[in-house]
Amino acid sequence: MSSAKMIGRAVASCRLSSKGLRSQSVDLSILLSRNTYPNTRTMASKAITMDNINPNIVKLEYAVRGPLVTRAGEIEKELQKGADKPFKKVIKANIGDAHAMGQQPITFIRQVLSCVANPEIIEKGNFPDDVKQRAKDILKACGGGSVGAYTVSYGIEMIRRHVAEYIQKRDGFPSDWNNVVLVGGASNGIKNCLQLLVNKINGKSSAVMIPIPQYPLYSASLAEYGLELVGYYLDEERQWGLSTEELERSYAGGQEKNNVRAIVVINPGNPTGQVLTRENIESIVKFAHAHNLFIFADEVYQDNVYAEGSKFFSFKKVMMEMGEPYNKMELASFMSVSKGYMGECGLRGGWMELVNLDPQVQANLFKAISAMLCPSSLGQSAVDCVAKPPAPGEPSYDLWIKEKTQVLDSLNKRAKMIAETFNQMEGFKCNIVQGAMYAFPQITLPPKAIEAAKKAGKAPDVFYAFQLLENTGICIVPGTGFGQKPGTYHFRTTILPQPALLQEMLDIFRTFHEKFTKQYS
């Protein structure tokens, strides 16, 4: 096969499906078969082989887009070809992609994006005056008046200033726009900061404390950079809260072989859906101060708080209100347009605020960021709409607040629905979804199912998830991909399917679980 044909087939497998969703799977058999290489060179003569590839890339795993998702994509293609299955569609409850699950875009954001992408329509289109002005302001800040131009590597200054104003209004403490960096999604900002820690000290590797269960971005990034992961367990019996005792246990164990240098906190939680109390945050801050740890505050779900009595507190706000010495601690906080009420995952927009970094360290971080050129201008434009939304009295305000409220109210109802339904099912235990976009139920599996999983070479929760997918078309993420206490089994499901589809999914889930339990009893 010619190289052109091989590349063509690989690209074809990634084209948009009839539903407009990009498949996550590439036909690897094309690339791995020894009979399809474009020349007669043997494997031994390849410049890059599995013997000399970066071992950190081999170790890297990302469960949210792992084998189950690949299989789900294959099943979708099989259904499109008329395959006979006991279901007609795949329900992707595995990933926090709101728009893919039917959430409608926020009008103000999309109108501004339309105008900056095609300036000719600003005056020709029937847009509100505040949309027109915002688009003009963004374009004025772009080189050549076009979002097609590179921006400053750290983001457009005007938008960084708006983010700083947003943070200051949220927390009640000053925010310097020079410490705000616009990023291509919060994930990029997190990875940029993690790179600062890649250094052996006195012969010991650097390590980062990560909550267990955790969002797989962290374990994947630590593996990629050769950093060590030190897990601290969240307490499922206490609504996925945490204790100082557990933090100290984790730190002491990690410090024996490594240099523990940072702690990651995800609030509201992914995959666990908890919202930390102010007391919890204060305890973490005091712990981090006692051990001189850098804090990664992953706060991308700060708008997603549902449970009565729950409230989001930013780490920066709590640190500042605690006063000295805590208000001098080093912190990086992260926000994204992918979550919240916006759900603009594909635009890849977000920001990070750097607090109390050593000026020389921050200069070197900015140097590293410069090598990546700049985040997407459209993503930055979406950030501007989030950081500075329409104000009361402006033409777009009434529709904006209506749409925002509808999205968050609907998510609130779905959060309650999913927890209540799982708790009514035998063998399930699900904590209240206080915030974020996920439930993380614990499931009791029959001993025979656990034995069948072992024979199949799979973890029990992975075995269960594959059975669920093959029999119902529902795609979830096994708890194994996030980490869990030994002897317990969980899975993560999003609350993002629209209400009717979510109810359908839960009904199918109930029927499947009853059959599964009966089969392996």
Located regions from the model:
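Conserved core of the PLP fold type I
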Residues: 115-292, 296, 302-325, 332-333, ...
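N-terminal "arm"/small-domain region of PLP-dependent enzymes with the aminotransferase-like
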Residues: 32, 40-154, 165, 169, ...
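PLP-dependent enzyme catalytic core of the Aspartate aminotransferase-like
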Residues: 2-10, 24, 119-120, 124, ...
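Short beta-strand
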Residues: 83-84, 90-92, 429-434, 521
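N-terminal mitochondrial targeting presequence
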Residues: 1-48
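Generic structural signal for small/hydrophobic residues in well-ordered secondary structure
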Residues: 68, 93, 163, 180, ...
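Conserved PLP-binding catalytic core of the aspartate aminotransferase-like
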Residues: 100-102, 107, 401-412, 416-471, ...
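Conserved core segment of the aminotransferase class I/II
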Residues: 6, 46-50, 130-137, 224, ...
